[in-house]
């Protein structure tokens, strides 16, 4: 087992993965969570599939290991990661299971909201007007605009 205290070789303090700066001083399992769409469990699973020691620091990884991580994160279904683990299941357009990362999440989210607004779904209309979407009360909270003071006694 390799020790994290003594490391021979190049240590990178910042690694670029999916257009995200990953801190090289953190352990790889937690460093991957900097990437949008990667949580602790998904990062742990990806490290296990790539045969990378989870006690390693992110800066200790070689280029080959980083490449393995990114290919597994790109194509999780090819590496026998179950479909319930993915964050985009049964896509409304093509019906495929996929895992969105970094900028893909923002694009897909925006597309979903635009589709809801276009078909005039209740959620889409609430999003359009900037109101609460998930059934919260709006009588007293969530007010915006000018504040109206209480009329004092004359």
Curated annotation (Swiss-Prot):
Main location group: cytoplasm
SUPFAM superfamilies: S13-like H2TH domain
GO MF assignments: rRNA binding; structural constituent of ribosome
Biological process annotations from GO: translation
One GO term describing the cellular component: cytosol
Gene3D superfamilies: 1.10.8.50, 30s ribosomal protein s13, domain 2
Signal peptide: none
Alphabetic keyword roster: Cytoplasm, Ribonucleoprotein, Ribosomal protein, RNA-binding, rRNA-binding
Highest taxon listed in the record's lineage: Eukaryota
Location relative to the cell: Cytoplasm
Family matches, as Pfam families: Ribosomal_S13
Functional description taken from the UniProt entry: Located at the top of the head of the 40S subunit, it contacts several helices of the 18S rRNA.
HAMAP family noted in UniProt: Ribosomal_uS13
Family that this chain belongs to: Belongs to the universal ribosomal protein uS13 family.
Record-given protein name: Small ribosomal subunit protein uS13
């Amino acid at each position: 087992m390799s020790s994290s205290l003594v490391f021979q070789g190049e240590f990178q303090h910042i690694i670029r993965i999916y257009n995200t700066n990953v801190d090289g001083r953190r352990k790889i399992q937690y460093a991957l969570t900097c990437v949008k769409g990667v949580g602790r469990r998904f990062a742990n699973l990806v490290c296990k599939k790539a045969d990378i020691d989870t006690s390693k620091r992110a800066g200790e990884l070689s280029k080959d290991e980083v490449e393995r991580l990114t290919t597994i994160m790109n194509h999780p279904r090819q590496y026998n990661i179950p479909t319930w683990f993915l964050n985009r299941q049964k896509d409304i357009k093509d019906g495929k299971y996929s895992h969105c990362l970094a900028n893909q999440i923002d694009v897909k989210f925006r597309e979903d909201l635009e589709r809801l607004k276009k078909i005039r779904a209740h959620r889409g209309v609430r999003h359009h007007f900037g109101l609460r979407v998930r059934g919260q009360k709006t009588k007293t909270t969530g007010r915006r605009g000018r504040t109206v003071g209480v009329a004092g006694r004359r």
